[in-house]
């Protein structure tokens, strides 16, 4: 005898079990939206493998598996992003000789600049990018990049003139 499960049976099963499964999935993730996504993914996975809708233990195990997969994926993504950020920071950060007093002053002055000006200044001087390339990288126009660069230079000049 063949066990035929209709689309309607799956809808009824989902509507009955989803609230409890979302609550179960919620213990693994921070948001209800993530928990709902996990339950939906688990139902799809469960349905594709043609498991019996009566096997609720396996359905909960599938929800747990999907949740743990999501957590592992998020950890791997965070690790990759942190490594990429470190690589970018090392490749774009200006290198100062902190034994040299003038360079130490320059480093301090650059650190005092607003972030928008500092990133343009670093990209222009230390990484030798054009204003067009800077604009593309930061999602701003090249004129805005040039303007921020001018403001940064003016602020540095003002800082050094006042120290003399």
Language model feature labels by segment:
Residues 1-23, 33, 47, 53, ...:
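A short, charge-rich alpha-helical start-of-domain segment used by transcription regulators
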Residues 12, 105-113:
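Short amphipathic alpha-helical boundary/capping segments
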Residues 18, 22, 43, 114, ...:
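C-terminal flanking helix
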Residues 37-44, 48, 54-65:
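Structural recognition of an alpha-helix C-terminal capping motif at a helix-to-coil junction
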Residues 54, 64-83, 99:
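Arg/Lys-rich amphipathic alpha helix in sigma70-family domain 2
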Residues 68, 138-162:
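DNA-recognition helix of helix-turn-helix
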Residues 77-107, 130:
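Internal acidic/polar
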Residues 120-124:
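A short pre-motif secondary-structure segment
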């Amino acid at each position: 005898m063949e066990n035929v499960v209709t689309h309607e049976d799956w809808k009824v099963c989902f509507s009955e079990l989803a609230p409890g499964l979302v609550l179960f999935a919620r213990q693994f993730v921070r948001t209800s939206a993530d928990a709902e996504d996990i339950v939906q993914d688990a139902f799809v996975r469960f349905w594709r493998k043609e498991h019996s809708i009566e096997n609720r233990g396996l359905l909960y195990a599938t929800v747990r598996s999907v949740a743990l997969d999501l957590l592992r994926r998020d950890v791997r993504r965070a690790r990759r992003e942190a490594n990429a950020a470190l690589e970018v920071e090392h490749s774009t950060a200006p290198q100062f000789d902190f034994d040299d007093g003038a360079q130490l002053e320059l480093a301090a002055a650059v650190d005092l600049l607003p972030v928008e000006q500092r990133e343009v200044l670093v990209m222009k001087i230390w990484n030798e990018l054009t204003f067009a390339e800077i604009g593309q990288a930061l999602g701003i126009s090249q004129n805005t990049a040039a303007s921020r660069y001018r403001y940064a230079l003016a602020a540095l000049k003002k800082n050094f003139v006042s120290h003399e």
